[in-house]
């Protein structure tokens, strides 16, 4: 076949994928919806809509339902997505463990397990992770219907297009082809993504930023990072990586960061840094509800909520530095909403006003007006970001078309 012929076939396949995705997205977002409404909103020919919906029904991805006509006449036939028969596994790979969750296509959690993964090399970690997923599948075989995808999210530098991991903060990796290893073992479509960016996408699909197309999520945990949603999509840079706001310098004379710089946001607004700051003050003799032998982010937030002055001052201090950095991001991206995630949000009544105060003095007035700063709604759902990657692949047609063809 000539290159021109191959290109023509490729273009036809792409058009099929885009058209199927357009129909599925409308049903997912607005269902119950009629075929006529789908044709009007998608601007596809009614015959094309009929053909695509027939294929989706035959595959079991959508179903017809009766809907009472508004005129009180004959019931109209509408369409909704079918989510119960298709399952995906989402994995949140942490520094020492993995949370593995079974989802249906509505994002409902059907099962969840935590597996310790103390391995410290790329090879042993891959072996242990794949075995943990296999064990999870075996444990929940009775609940599992059609497994359509496995998705893994993790901290580090991830190339989602190649499915390779180039850096992780706790073990040395070298072009780790995790997607290839997963697909070879489990024979399903697999995805890999960055944990914070994937959480930002999950908030857009299912959580605090469902009502807007442009948002920034900032998460404080072992480090500090951001996920940026622009026009409803994850904003990514070269090799799929962007949003390392934890390494913006906020204190030029501050402590040395593990990146080699001094005074990065992460040296102030990370769980360990917050705990160490409170611990140092306690050792200096400052009074607090926080016990010296239990100085954790959880007890610090709890004390701040009860009005403890030391805990509140530290949370406010962290909030001001977060606000300073977020103001820079606001001036760059002009989002419609800011979402804050991490254990520190347990003290949101202290934290969020401190962030907002800084934004109100350092972000452009036109950008900060009517800009909500809210707490994450999904931070407690470890693997929801992994499922968001599966959801995206259904909505953009990549996984959807694969299901239609197989």
UniProtKB/Swiss-Prot annotation:
Keywords: Activator, Carbohydrate metabolism, DNA-binding, Repressor, Transcription, Transcription regulation. It comes from the Bacteria. One of its GO terms (biological process) is regulation of DNA-templated transcription. Disruption phenotype: A double deletion with priB is disadvantageous to cells. InterPro entries: ATPase_NBD, HTH_MarR-typ, ROK, ROK_cs, WH-like_DNA-bd_sf, WH_DNA-bd_sf. Induction: By N-acetylglucosamine. GO terms for molecular function: DNA binding; DNA-binding transcription factor activity. Belongs to the ROK (NagC/XylR) family. This is DNA-binding transcriptional dual regulator NagC. The gene is nagC.
